[in-house]
């Protein structure tokens, strides 16, 4: 328990009083569930559940002053409620969209899938050396299959059959999760008994994250500072936490690590994970010798989302929005991909003059406002603030991968490739020992590689999208950060970007231990990659961590054969279209409707 001085307690009280005046975020911020149980505090006086900030305030008071927490299940209410249907607004926006996975074996298959995706303006969710996930309208599936070779027509796997419903169930309930209502498609689980984890029981909107960050900084002023990296296109601050303890009169350049998430707005798990790691380091200082040493030797810059405009947009309008929200040459296709707009090997020609593409990198290097703001900030810190950036970790989702430079090309190798691979394997080991999750380690070049066991050499495939202009490559090559990684977090496709909230804390612990492993490596510890020392600051999995995904293996494809190859599912194809490879004018109509929905 961290001790507070009298002055700090008074300051915290003043801040908590300020926070308590902030109204709970409106249910208009996301599709509210149409019915929720009401907590009964007496037989005659029903009361609405406590607002989020009231509960956060109470949890702070309970933690700091040792007030016994109130019982979280009043009256023993443990009734289960049936899932509610997605509201009409979501059905209108997402229609009958689904997500399919295609297993790839040959370069011709990849080429055909790339061309078909571009023709139909399809949303590619993720791609690895084994599969590609694509979102599309159900009635467009036969048209897509008609453009593909027969081998792909028989190897598509349904991942998400009802996208609007899955999106609806990914939003947090405006009521406390302990109320007893659990989403119907998830196994029920008790909320964490640790009152300090209340913030991580759900994904949080930006209107909650920023005051929470300020609260942390005010509680722990000795080693946490709330800062702004710059301003977004719409004028929002890009919030961050600087965590570390710099000795007085220290003239050495301060070694600093950046841990960033949310450059792609829809990847909520990256935002929550950055917050979790920051919280864990801040609250463990002075309790763990290993963590205290890290914060005395390094500064950590935690940026939950470099894309605040896009993140807010995913809460208020389109849950699956990827880019930022700045204007482009086409008024109905706003946004720049903030991970394709950086200056090193920017490849804007790959996306042409089409701002409607999800990977559009802008019309020039650093066209993305927020990427330019971050680049200018790190330059200023280096030139004027005596800072040396030694590591960069960019959190994305999904597919469970640890990627190192380069992203723009598989033909170039970084000079310290062996060290990058060694550390990446150590990070993967730390994650595996935490929750038995397997993360693949590879270059981020993005060239899909055929996994054909009969071939002596893998075959380089055509890419699904441009991979130039990445933040990973810029920090490594242009800015000289020796250890730069992109982590693609859970899962491997069962939920994709709509990862249920039960995974927030387990994923946070995995990445926290990965950061601890990174810190030990940077400190030069000779035993950094040996078994995790659970008494040296690493976080153990516990009974409250109930990941809903299979931990026995990481093949999350529910609809696969025993050999791992997907089977054809004719339920996606209307009877009148089976065997008919002709396209009609409805293809273009669906694509245009999708663009207009933006």
From Swiss-Prot:
Binds 1 zinc ion per subunit. It is found in: Vacuole; Secreted. One of its GO terms (cellular component) is extracellular region. Residues 1-21 form the signal peptide. Residues 202-522 form the Peptidase M14 domain. Disulfide bonds join 333-356. Glycans are attached at residue 349. Its cofactor is Zn(2+). Zn(2+) binds at residues 264, 267, 396. One of its GO terms (biological process) is cell wall organization. Residues 564-581 have a biased composition (Basic and acidic residues). InterPro entries: Peptidase_M14. It holds the Pfam family Peptidase_M14. One of its GO terms (molecular function) is zinc ion binding. Keywords: Cell wall biogenesis/degradation, Disulfide bond, Glycoprotein, Metal-binding, Secreted, Signal, Vacuole, Zinc. Residues 22-174 form a propeptide. Residues 539-598 are annotated as: Disordered. It comes from the Eukaryota. Substrate binds at residues 264-267, 322, 339-340, 397-398. Belongs to the peptidase M14 family. Inactive carboxypeptidase that may play a role in cell wall organization and biogenesis. This is Inactive metallocarboxypeptidase ECM14.
């Amino acid at each position: 328990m961290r001790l507070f001085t009298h002055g700090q307690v008074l300051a915290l009280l003043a801040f908590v009083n300020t926070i308590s005046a902030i109204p709970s975020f409106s249910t208009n911020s996301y599709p509210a569930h149409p019915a929720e149980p009401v907590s009964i505090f007496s037989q005659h006086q029903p009361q609405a559940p406590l607002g989020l900030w009231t509960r956060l305030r109470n949890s702070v008071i309970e933690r700091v002053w040792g007030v016994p927490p109130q019982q979280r299940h009043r009256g023993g209410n443990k009734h289960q409620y049936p899932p509610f249907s997605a509201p009409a607004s979501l059905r209108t926006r997402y229609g009958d969209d689904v997500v399919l996975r295609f297993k790839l074996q040959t370069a011709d298959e990849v080429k055909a899938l790339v061309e078909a995706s571009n023709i139909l303006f399809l949303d590619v969710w993720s791609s690895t050396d084994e599969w590609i996930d694509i979102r599309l309208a159900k009635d467009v599936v036969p048209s897509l299959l008609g453009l593909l070779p027969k081998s792909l027509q028989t190897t598509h796997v349904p991942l998400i059959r009802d996208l609007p419903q899955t999106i609806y169930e990914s939003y947090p309930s405006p009521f406390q999760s302990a109320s007893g209502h659990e989403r119907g498609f998830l196994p029920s689980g008790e909320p964490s008994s640790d009152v300090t984890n209340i913030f991580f029981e759900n994904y949080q909107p930006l209107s909650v994250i920023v005051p929470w960050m300020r609260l942390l900084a005010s509680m722990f002023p000795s080693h946490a500072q709330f800062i702004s990296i710059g301003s977004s296109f719409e004028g929002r601050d890009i919030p961050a936490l600087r965590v570390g303890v710099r000795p007085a009169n220290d003239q050495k350049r301060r070694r600093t690590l950046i841990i960033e998430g949310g450059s792609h707005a829809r990847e909520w798990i990256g935002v929550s994970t950055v917050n979790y790691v920051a919280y864990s380091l801040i609250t463990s200082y002075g309790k763990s010798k290993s963590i205290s040493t890290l914060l005395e030797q390094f500064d950590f810059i935690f940026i939950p989302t470099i894309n605040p405009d896009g993140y807010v947009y995913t809460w208020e309008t389109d849950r699956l929005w990827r880019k930022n929200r700045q204007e482009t040459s086409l008024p109905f296709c706003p946004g720049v991909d903030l991970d394709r707009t950086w200056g090193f090997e920017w490849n804007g020609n790959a996306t042409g003059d089409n701002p409607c593409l999800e990977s559009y990198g802008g019309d020039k290097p650093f066209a993305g406002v927020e990427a330019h703001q971050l680049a200018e900030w790190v330059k200023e810190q280096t030139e004027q603030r005596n800072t040396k950036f030694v590591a960069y970790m960019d959190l994305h989702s999904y597919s469970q991968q640890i990627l190192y430079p380069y992203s723009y090309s598989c033909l170039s190798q970084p000079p310290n490739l062996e060290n990058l691979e060694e550390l990446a394997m150590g990070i993967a080991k730390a994650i595996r020992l935490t929750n038995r999750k397997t993360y693949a380690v590879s270059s981020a070049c993005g060239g899909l590689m055929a996994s054909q066991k009969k071939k002596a050499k893998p075959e380089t495939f055509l890419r699904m999208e441009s991979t130039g202009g990445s933040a990973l490559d810029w920090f490594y090559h242009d800015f000289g950060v020796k250890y730069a990684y992109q982590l693609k977090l859970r899962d491997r496709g069962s939920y994709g970007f709509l990862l249920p909230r039960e995974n927030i804390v387990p994923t946070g612990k995995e990445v926290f231990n990965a950061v601890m492993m990174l810190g030990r490596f940077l400190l030069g510890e000779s035993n950094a990659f040996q078994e995790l020392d659970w008494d040296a600051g690493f976080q153990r999995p516990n009974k409250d961590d109930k990941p809903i995904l299979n931990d026995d293996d990481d093949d999350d494809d529910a609809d696969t054969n025993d050999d791992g190859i997907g089977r054809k599912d004719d339920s996606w194809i209307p009877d009148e279209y089976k065997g008919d490879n002709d396209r009609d004018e409805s293809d273009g109509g669906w694509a245009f409707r999708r663009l207009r929905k933006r």
